[in-house]
Amino acid sequence: MSLKEVITSLKNDFHSINKEIDSMKENNEKQEDKIFQEIKKLKLEMELLRKDNLSFKTTIQSLSDSINSLSSVESTYDSDLYYDDDEYSTIYL
């Protein structure tokens, strides 16, 4: 092989390697874009879950408040009841 042929072969190899590098860069950029899109999607899902969780907590708190309110009404009602032992424990209001 002559020196000119070797240089031409090396240039072709170099050109081929540069094409591969460019292709790899492009693939990496595409993968990065996919990863960033997935991260965005996951962040949105996390935010929705946080909101759902907050809504759930609010609902639970509301139910708890309602139960406490009912308990308070029940205890008020119970305090109006009394038993007459002479009448076989009949309940009077």
Swiss-Prot record:
It comes from the Eukaryota. Keywords: Coiled coil. Residues 2-58 form a coiled coil. Belongs to the UPF0521 family. This is UPF0521 protein A. It comes from Dictyostelium discoideum.
